[in-house]
Amino acid sequence: MTQSQQSHRKDEHVFLAEKYFQSVAHAGFDQVRLLHRALPETTMAAVDLKPDLPFNWQWPIYINAMTGGSPQTGKLNAQLGQLAQALGVAIASGSQSVALRDPQLVPTFATLRDHDPNGFILANVGAGHHATAAEAAVAMLKANALEIHLNAAQEVVMPEGDRDFMWQANIKSIIATSQVPIVVKEVGNGFIREDLQSLQQLGVQFVDVGGRGGTNFATIENARRSGHDFAYLQDWGQTTVESLLEARGLGLTMLATGGVRSPLDVVKALRLGAHAVGMSGMVLHHLIQTGYEATLAYFQNFLHQLRQLYALLGVTNWQELQEAPIVLSADLEHYRQARGLPGI
């Protein structure tokens, strides 16, 4: 694939992600009910939102992987880096595979670090890459951590996608040689418990569930196919909420992404065991539709509302939130029981 073809594909992904963006997502958060406390017995000043992570993050949200690899997406990455710095949140790069193949595309990713010189940045490679490529991706961004993305469904539907999914040896090798923490993530189809246990056996500690309900790369890649013949995979995978239930009790440090649309969604994900929550489609949508300044104001208010919701629930930190009363819908409770998953 030529550089122009690679760049065009990256631009297509952004266009289609925005085209298929849904303001009301179907990630399962509507099936989770946090119960109101009439006597919260707390103060907003007492709320500590700092996540229980060894990354020194100040907020329990981060901007998740999106883009890079073309002049247009490079401009978006510059805005995203600037936004992350202004908000004081971590940010993950889009997949750097194209820049590893073509060094001329490196600036479209490195602009994240240029605009967020002191922030926490996660590099990003696919699980098909070896340890040397992972090291190069980290060096490209002077990254603080590395995401390894799992995207089998996307690759199957992508006309030019990979067809080799023998990934576990690569993951194990990257973990063994990496100088930075590793986060293994799905890109929108979620996890089941068996795969999470396999990751544990490889030495993985940090997992982003990347559940169904947000940006759907199977749908995006199907739109790029002439016959659009994979439409039936639109609902493939486990939702973000189902994936969090699958992870309970395993001892992994979970991050949650996929279909997060509100501060309440964030708090629900945290209550289900996520230590931090990522957003990508929401951020991209606001940047494209409203511009940088309005997006910054929106997410500043978003962060403030997290503090308000903690106080409303009568909790002051993540540990206390784990004890907040919660009810699952009948369908979600049936899923939990059918899968033999721990209670909440």
From Swiss-Prot:
Subcellular location field: Cytoplasm
Q: Which residues are FMN-binding?
A: A65, M66, T67, S95, N124, K185, T215, G259, V260, R261, S280, G281
Q: Which InterPro entries match?
A: Aldolase_TIM (IPR013785), FMN-dep_DH (IPR000262), IPdP_isomerase (IPR011179)
Primary location recorded for the protein, binned into one broad class: cytoplasm
Task: Name the positions where Mg(2+) binds.
Answer: E155
Entry EC number(s): 5.3.3.2
Q: Where does substrate bind?
A: R9, K10, Q154
Write out the GO cellular component annotations.
cytoplasm
An example of a Pfam family matching this protein is: FMN_dh
Q: Which domain of life is it from?
A: Bacteria
Tell me the Gene3D superfamilies matching this sequence.
Aldolase class I
The alphabetical list of record keywords is: Cytoplasm, Flavoprotein, FMN, Isomerase, Isoprene biosynthesis, Magnesium, Metal-binding, NADP
Q: Which GO terms describe its molecular function?
A: FMN binding; isopentenyl-diphosphate delta-isomerase activity; magnesium ion binding; NADPH binding; oxidoreductase activity
Please cite one Gene Ontology biological process associated with this protein.
isoprenoid biosynthetic process
Reaction catalysed by this chain?
isopentenyl diphosphate = dimethylallyl diphosphate
Its family remark reads:
Belongs to the IPP isomerase type 2 family.
Q: What function does this protein fulfil?
A: Involved in the biosynthesis of isoprenoids. Catalyzes the 1,3-allylic rearrangement of the homoallylic substrate isopentenyl (IPP) to its allylic isomer, dimethylallyl diphosphate (DMAPP).
What the entry lists under HAMAP family is as follows:
Idi_2
Report quaternary structure and partners: Homooctamer. Dimer of tetramers.
In Swiss-Prot or TrEMBL terms, this protein is called Isopentenyl-diphosphate delta-isomerase
Q: What is the lineage of its organism?
A: Bacteria, Bacillati, Bacillota, Bacilli, Lactobacillales
